[in-house]
């Protein structure tokens, strides 16, 4: 997707280690960014891959209900600023779509679009699968005052300890090969940490991330992708009005 159409651009794409990649993404027009994220979330072509029957209908109902909620309560077509709610959707969807488009990994919809709605945090935010058929579990975090990589990495490690990756297989089993799901249970999996970032230089940011204890734990897995989204950046041409807005229960 061209920058002029999506309102953001990839400014860094680096290999940290052979199995660890870092992307840095910067919004150039937050109104366009929000619009493109909503449009991306609203694509339902993945549902058409199912050959009719109850699965197609089940996913259609969940998808439409969630999209209606997002478009009515979180991201509106004419929004030109971010809230804490919409920021996490922006981070999740930009990270997910970047990995799909740049690495040609499996296009799996955002977790909230395919999961049965439950109280509390049910698991990972998004998923993909690499060229080796290893499933990747993604988590997005937004913090207004600081780089949020620590929060994202910490949450991933907590979810891993609680075996949320394994429990999430129930939600994505119809979108991934059975063999890949079985490999997750054997420990063969990867993770994606997507997070809001400020103006810290990329070299310093990566250096700090590599010192994080949770990064060290996750780096032992098959693949780790880091996606920094500069939605805390402010200058004369790019004022991102970040407002506090507690997440509403769906």
Describe every region a protein language model picked out.
Residues 126, 136-142:
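Conserved catalytic cores of phosphodiester-cleaving nucleases, focusing on short active-site segments
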Residues 131-133:
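Glycine-centered tight beta-turn/hairpin loop motif at sheet-sheet or coil-to-beta transitions
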Residues 141-203:
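Catalytic cores of nucleic-acid endonucleases
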Residues 1-93:
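Interdomain/boundary linker segments immediately adjacent to catalytic/signaling cores
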Residues 98-119:
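A short acidic/basic microdomain associated with nuclease active sites
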Residues 122-129:
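Short acidic loop-to-beta-strand element that houses the catalytic metal-binding Asp/Glu
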Residues 24-29, 35-40, 58, 62-71, ...:
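Charged, structured surface patches that assemble and position nucleic-acid processing machinery
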Residues 82, 102-106, 157-163, 238-248:
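Charged, terminal alpha-helix-loop-beta segments
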């Amino acid at each position: 997707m061209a920058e002029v159409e999506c309102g953001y651009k990839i400014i860094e794409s680096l290999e940290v280690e052979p199995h660890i990649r870092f992307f840095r993404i910067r919004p150039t027009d937050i109104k366009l960014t929000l619009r493109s994220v909503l449009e991306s979330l609203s694509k339902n072509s993945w549902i058409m891959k199912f050959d009719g029957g109850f699965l197609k209908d089940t996913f259609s109902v969940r998808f439409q209900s969630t999209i209606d909620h997002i478009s009515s309560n979180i991201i509106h077509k004419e929004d030109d600023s971010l809230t804490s709610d919409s920021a996490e959707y922006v981070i999740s969807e930009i990270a997910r779509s970047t990995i799909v488009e740049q690495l040609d990994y499996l296009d799996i919809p955002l977790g909230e679009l395919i999961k049965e709605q439950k109280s509390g945090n049910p698991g990972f935010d998004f998923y993909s699968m690499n060229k080796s058929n290893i499933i990747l579990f993604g988590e997005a975090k937004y913090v207004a005052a600081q780089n949020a990589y620590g929060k994202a990495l910490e949450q991933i490690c907590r979810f891993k300890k609680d075996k949320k990756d394994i429990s999430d297989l129930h939600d994505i089993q119809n979108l991934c090969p059975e063999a890949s799901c079985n490999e997750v249970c054997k420990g063969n999996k990867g993770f994606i940490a997507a997070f809001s970032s400020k103006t810290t230089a990329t070299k310093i940011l990566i250096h700090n991330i590599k010192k994080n204890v949770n990064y060290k734990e996750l780096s032992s897995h098959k693949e780790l992708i880091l996606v920094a989204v500069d939605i805390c950046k402010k200058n004369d041409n790019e004022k991102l009005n970040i407002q506090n807005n507690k997440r509403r229960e769906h």
